[in-house]
Every structure is written in structure tokens, then in C-alpha cells.
Design a protein with these regions (language model features):
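Polybasic, positively charged surfaces/segments
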Residues: 2-337
Length: 337
């Protein structure tokens, strides 16, 4: 589909950006584009650049079969240079030679109050009264059975970058650490928000626990598909970009995805915009009623083989941290297969 035939750049406003993509939100009147986001590649060095078509094929062939229930469908659309040039990218450089973009549903469509809990965890509280929806956005990063080091890879990297401790993603994987993980996850939420959730009888913590105790939840799936014999050693053994297999590229992609977990009061309209429900679960809570839990996974971007030197440089820096002792950072859970 040629997007310029049904819309103009003025119908799109800046929404967000990552390290490789920029998102625009549709504000026009065309029904087909309502509640949609336009995802466009940012400018990169040619050697590191992966085209939208390559990404689309990778996601459809490699990622979609793994996460069919929580996959956000994307449509490949044709872009024109003139259309790209007229978008307000807020100074971010777009890859103007790219002929394609991706059209995706806006998971955050609606009115929400955003609370940034940490670098990789955002909380969105719906503004509708009474409260109908709560969304967590989490980047779980590396998920694996840590049986050797004091700190997992994610917590080690957060220490390297001087981020304060929030929660360890490994705690979300095991029956005996889920409650600890959730306590840490919820700890930065402002008291007034917790009071609102309690007052509105919206048991989001209990719902999150129910989600995590399902044996097929997205975190356990990510752990399964990220599995290697030795996550760090495998990277350090690479000699050139040619040594980066498609399987390793997939694993590195899955170590950098984001997850939206949406909790909403259940009624006949819940999830009506997405009949597949994409990983939905209806959960009944005594005294609270029924809730719908929806999980969406995003940022399934194929990692360039040229990044292997960057991955190795990070591992070298993390070496002294893995088994260090930080009084401000409790050790991570150790768990054998």
C-alpha cells in the first residue's frame, strides 16, 4: 500500500523513538489509519543498516511463529521521499533512502497518565472513570538461569550505567521469587497511585501475579527462546561478523524486546479491536470481578551482525561486576536448570 495515496505528512505527529526507529501517531480522519502508528527507520551507517523489508521478513518468518498469541501485526507500506521529508521528526534523521515503513496498532491508544518507574519500566494509568485500564511496559532484557554469578547480566549492566536498582527480571521467572519480584517492581509506584488502585478496586498486583504464574507467560517464553549454553562466553568467542549466525541474531533480538502487559476490566467490549486477543486471559478475582490481561511484544528488530564488537566490549566491562559485592544492590537469584 502506498501511504501517500490516503494520507499526508500533516496527519502524522511525532510519538516516540528508539535507537533504530521513529514512531509517528496518526491524527487524521481516515478510518483505516485510526489508532495506528507509522514506524520508520532512523538513519544508520550503510554497513549496519537493515532495511524495513529485511526486518519484516525476519519478524514474520522467525519471530511470529514463536509469539503468535502476543504478536503485534504490522503492515508493510510504501513510502515516498517527499512524504518522509515533510514529516516532523523533531530533528531526528530519517533514512530517506528507505522505501518502506511499517503500520502497526497503537497499543497505548487512549488517555493515560504515565509514570516512569525506571529506565526499562513504565506504568500507564487510564484516565477513564471508573478506572478501566492499567498498562505496564517492560523491557525484560536477558532472561536465563543464572547459576554462577552474584548479579545477572541485566542487573550488572544497570550497575555499569549507574541506574538505581528497581527489580531483577529473573525474579519474575520462578515460583518462589515472583512475590519478591513484584514487590520490587511496584516499589517506585507513587503512594497516591497505589491508593487510587485500592480505592477503585483494581487489584493489578494480584492480576500480575496470576499472569506470571501461568506456565506459558511471555517471560518464560522469552527465557526459553533466548537459551544458550553460556550467554556471555558465546559472544566472546566470535571472531568476525560472519560468525554471528541467524540464530544468535534472533537471540540478541529477543534480549532487547519490549512487552506491554495490559490489565482491563472485562466486559463484552474488552479486546473488541483485536478479536485474536493476542495472549489475552480472562481472570476472575473475588470481590473485584473479571479482568482481561493482554500481552503484546514489540521491538522485534533483527540485530546487525556488525554489532558483535559492541556486544563483546560490553561483556568485557561487565566482567568485574558479575561477581562483585555492591551494598546498594542485593544479589540476584541463582537457579539451576
Amino acid at each position: 500500500m502506498e501511504i501517500a495515496k490516503i494520507t499526508t505528512p500533516k496527519d502524522w505527529v511525532y510519538f516516540a523513538k528508539g535507537s533504530a526507529n521513529i514512531l509517528f501517531k496518526y491524527i487524521g480522519s481516515h478510518d483505516f489509519l485510526k489508532d495506528k502508528l507509522l514506524r520508520i527507520r532512523l538513519a544508520k551507517e550503510t554497513a549496519e543498516y537493515i532495511s524495513t523489508c529485511e526486518l519484516y521478513d525476519f519478524v514474520e518468518l522467525k519471530c511470529k511463529p514463536l509469539f503468535a498469541d502476543s504478536f503485534i501485526d504490522a503492515q508493510l507500506i510504501v513510502l515516498e521521499q517527499q512524504f518522509l521529508a515533510q514529516l516532523d521528526s523533531r530533528g531526528n534523521k530519517i533514512m530517506t533512502s528507505e522505501r518502506y515503513g511499517l503500520l502497526t496498532p497503537n497499543v497505548l491508544n487512549g488517555d493515560y497518565i504515565r509514570h516512569s518507574l525506571s529506565k526499562h519500566c513504565q506504568l500507564y494509568i487510564g484516565t477513564q472513570e471508573p478506572l478501566q485500564q492499567v498498562i505496564f511496559e517492560i523491557k525484560p532484557k536477558w532472561l536465563y538461569d543464572n547459576n554462577q554469578t552474584n548479579y545477572c547480566r541485566t542487573c550488572s549492566l544497570n550497575q555499569l550505567r549507574d541506574h538505581p536498582r528497581h527489580f531483577c527480571p529473573l525474579d519474575l521467572l520462578y515460583e518462589d521469587t515472583i512475590n519478591k519480584g513484584l514487590s520490587d517492581l511496584f516499589s517506585p509506584i507513587p503512594d497516591e497511585v497505589l491508593s487510587q488502585l485500592d480505592r477503585e478496586k483494581f487489584p493489578v498486583k494480584k492480576l500480575f501475579e496470576a499472569f506470571l504464574r501461568k506456565p506459558d507467560n511471555v517471560f518464560l517464553k522469552l527465557k526459553c527462546y533466548q537459551k544458550t549454553n553460556d550467554p556471555s562466553a558465546e559472544l566472546m568467542q566470535l571472531q568476525s561478523s560472519k560468525d554471528v549466525s541467524i540464530d544468535l541474531s534472533l537471540i540478541m533480538t529477543l534480549r532487547d524486546v519490549g512487552v506491554f502487559i495490559k490489565f482491563e476490566r472485562y466486559n463484552n467490549e474488552s479486546g473488541s479491536q483485536n478479536p485474536k486477543h493476542m495472549g489475552d486471559n480472562i481472570v476472575s478475582m473475588d470481590e473485584y470481578g473479571k479482568f482481561l490481561i493482554t500481552c503484546n511484544i514489540y521491538d522485534l528488530d533483527l540485530k546487525s551482525q556488525m554489532k558483535f564488537k559492541y556486544w563483546q566490549s560490553i561483556e568485557v566491562k561487565l566482567g568485574p561486576i558479575y561477581n562483585s559485592s555492591n551494598p546498594n544492590w542485593i544479589p540476584c537469584v541463582k537457579h539451576s536448570d
